[in-house]
From Swiss-Prot:
Source organism of the structure: Clostridium botulinum (strain Loch Maree / Type A3)
Recorded catalytic activity of this chain's protein: L-seryl-tRNA(Sec) + selenophosphate + H(+) = L-selenocysteinyl-tRNA(Sec) + phosphate
SUPFAM superfamilies for this protein: PLP-dependent transferases
Broad class of enzyme this protein falls into: transferase
Pfam families the UniProt entry points to: Se-cys_synth_N (PF12390), SelA (PF03841)
GO cellular component: cytoplasm
Name of encoding gene: selA
Lineage: Bacteria, Bacillati, Bacillota, Clostridia, Eubacteriales
Superkingdom of this protein's organism: Bacteria
Identification of the protein by name: L-seryl-tRNA(Sec) selenium transferase
Length: 462
């Protein structure tokens, strides 16, 4: 059939609205939604005809496409996905998962009025920071604390407060890109601090900082390179040395820890990562870090340190533009409460639990998932193998966590096609692919995910 005839055969919306099946959908959905979905279906087939991609179609084809389109239009764009990649803090999949306590706190505060900026004792306006400041001070040992909407904002606010139109001295090897093309030099530029690079990419000495101090110096800045490692012939100035230099010249020392861990992971067999507490104990004046990375909470930028500096930041006009909302505060409060007892934090904060859970636990879980798949899904091969998970989120670069995975392949469908179908399924499942095998890392899976995975695998060859 020629192209013109195919185009003439496209059904009209009014014609389709008379179909019994469409009428059923009209009874359950708004007319606008149904008509828009019908229009999308007709437009789809018109486009396929014009591209010469089809040489025939039926009204039933158009209706079936409409049904899929309607369901897609009804569903939310922000979806739950199942993370089978083994990357714990997966930036593209939302980073850290919240603890149950944090979720309950968010629900309570979001469905009711709250004392967000109301002092119940005094009966007058209060500060939104008061809800978490005492908790942050308790778990970090800081004199004072405040929270903004992300760590880039925390760095910008701190620099703007400490050295607007003055110089911030930083090692050239610490001018990191923190993801999404956001770079420390760019954040500094918008803070109106003047960047002074010292040292080289791999080696920076104390005298590099001292030789560049002048009457216009505002801060000595240290940035933890949490998302990469420089190996070999390297040298960097310790926090203790920078604090001594700052005291000598009466300059504040600021450290951006980035991933912001409150747990010393070296106690559990990992490479040492500086903790917020250790930086403060060494005398660093201002420390900034993220809430949704190693802390395991919501997206937030947390600033801790000397009270005289934090108080100035609270009064900075930028603070209102960068402040966090009540739901983030509620989630952060629920997360921080877990840290009063480290054992409780590891048990209840999903990020910590996933990172620190032993591979033996995951071996048993991988075997359970394999059995369920084998018992319910035909034409696929399943095997349990040792593998390595990642922390992710620009944290612990180079660190790999021993784990167990389920590897999947089939003679009837390629691994790439399996990955695509799982990703586009009603319950999106994100996997890894290696050597024509699909890899399901159980470290980042919950038991509740297993049944969903089995059901989606059943549909792959249909």
């Amino acid at each position: 059939m020629d192209k013109k005839q195919l185009l003439r055969n496209l059904p009209k919306i009014d014609e389709l609205l008379k179909e019994e099946i469409i009428n059923r959908y009209l009874q359950e959905n708004s007319r606008t939604l149904v008509v828009d979905s019908l229009r999308e279906s007709i437009d789809h087939y018109r486009g396929e005809i014009l591209k010469n991609n089809i040489d025939s179609f039926t009204k039933e084809n158009v209706v079936n496409y409409f049904i899929d389109t309607l369901e897609e239009n009804k569903s939310t764009k922000f979806k739950k996905v199942i993370n089978a990649t083994g990357v714990v803090i997966h930036t593209n999949l939302g980073r850290s998962l919240l603890a149950k306590e944090a979720i309950e706190n968010v629900v309570k505060v979001s469905e009711n009025y709250s004392n967000l900026e109301y002092d119940l004792k005094e009966g007058k306006r209060g500060s939104r920071y008061s809800h978490v400041e005492e908790l942050i001070k308790k778990v970090t040992g800081a004199e004072a604390a405040m929270v903004v909407n992300n760590n880039a904002a925390a760095v910008m606010l701190a620099l703007n407060t400490l050295c607007e139109e003055r110089e911030a001295i930083v090692s050239r090897g610490q001018l990191v890109e923190i993801g999404g093309s956001f770079r420390v030099p760019d954040v500094m530029k918008f803070s109106r601090a003047h960047l002074v690079e010292v040292g080289t990419t791999n080696r920076t000495h104390l005298y590099d900082y001292e030789n560049n101090i002048n009457e216009n110096t505002g801060v000595l800045l240290k940035v933890h390179t949490s998302n990469f490692k420089i190996m070999g012939f390297t040298e960097e100035v310790s926090s203790e040395e920078m604090v001594q230099l700052g005291e000598k010249y009466k300059l504040p020392v600021m450290e951006d820890i980035g991933s912001g861990t409150l747990v010393d992971f070296s106690k559990y067999g990992f490479t040492y990562e500086p903790t917020v507490q250790s930086s403060l104990e060494k005398g660093v004046d201002v420390v900034t870090f993220s809430g949704d990375k190693m802390l395991g909470g919501p997206q937030a930028g947390i600033i801790v340190g000397k009270k005289k500096y934090i108080d100035k930041m609270k009064k900075n006009q930028l603070t209102r533009a960068l402040r966090i909302d009540k739901m983030t505060l509620a989630a952060l409060e629920g997360t921080l409460k877990c840290y009063i007892d480290e054992k409780e934090a590891i048990e209840n904060i999903p990020t910590l639990n996933m990172i620190l859970s032993s591979k033996d636990i995951h071996k048993k879980r991988a075997q359970r998932l394999k059995r369920r798949l084998q018992n319910n899904v035909k034409d696929f091969n399943f095997k349990v193998s040792e593998d390595l998970s990642m922390v992710g989120g620009g944290s612990m670069p180079g660190e790999r966590i021993p784990t167990y995975v389920v590897k999947v392949n089939s003679d009837k469908i390629t691994a790439e096609k399996i990955e695509e179908k799982l990703r586009l399924s009603k319950n999106p499942i994100i996997v890894r692919v290696s050597k024509d095998e699909v890899i399901l890392d159980v470290r980042t899976l919950f038991e509740r995910d297993f049944n969903i995975i089995v059901e989606e695998f059943k549909k792959l060859l249909k």
